[in-house]
Amino acid sequence: MAKQKKHPSGTIAQNKKALHDYFIEQRFEAGVALAGWEVKSLRAGKAQLVDSYVLLKDGEAWLLGSHITPLTTASTHVIADPVRTRKLLLHKRELGKLFGAVQQKGYACVALSMYWKKHLVKCEIALAKGKKDFDKRHTEKERDSDREIQRAMRHGKDD
C-alpha cells in the first residue's frame, strides 16, 4: 500500500487546478458545516477539491463538487453521500462582498483548500477571474524562467 503524502501545516486538500485556471483577486476563510463521518474522513485525509466551486444562493454560500470519501468503518445507519452540497459559514459582510463581485461579469468564487484550524475544518475560498489560454501560457513561462534563475543562482553559489 502506498504511503499518503503529508500536507503542510494541517492542510487536508488543495485545489491546484483553480490556481492554474484563475487569477486570484481576494481570499476568504469559511467554516464548513459537516457531518460526523465527514470529519473522520477528513482526519484520514480523504478529500478532493478538484472540480469544486462555491454557489451563492439566497444569501448563503454552498460548496459544490467537493468529494469526501467515506471510511469503510463509517456507521451503517447513516447513508454517506460523498459529493453532497456543504454549507459554508461566512460573516454577512463577507457574503455581501462575494455576492457583489460575482454579479459582475467575469468573476467566480472557487474553493482553494481545506485545512484544520485548531479542531475546526476551514475552507479557503477565493474571488477569482478566469484566465484565458494565453494567460496560462504566460504564467507557465514566468514560472519556468524563475526556476531557471533559481537554478543559476544555486550553481553560482557552488563555485
From Swiss-Prot:
Region (Disordered): 132-159
Swiss-Prot/TrEMBL keywords: Cytoplasm, RNA-binding
Pfam families: SmpB
The keyword Lipoprotein is annotated on this UniProt entry: no
Entry keyword Glycosyltransferase: no
Signal peptide start-end: none
Primary location group: cytoplasm
PROSITE patterns linked to this entry: SSRP
Single GO BP term: trans-translation
One Gene Ontology MF term: RNA binding
GO cellular component, one term: cytosol
Top-level lineage group: Bacteria
Similarity field: Belongs to the SmpB family.
Purpose of the protein: Required for rescue of stalled ribosomes mediated by trans-translation. Binds to transfer-messenger RNA (tmRNA), required for stable association of tmRNA with ribosomes. tmRNA and SmpB together mimic tRNA shape, replacing the anticodon stem-loop with SmpB. tmRNA is encoded by the ssrA gene; the 2 termini fold to resemble tRNA(Ala) and it encodes a 'tag peptide', a short internal open reading frame. During trans-translation Ala-aminoacylated tmRNA acts like a tRNA, entering the A-site of stalled ribosomes, displacing the stalled mRNA.
Protein name, UniProt field: SsrA-binding protein
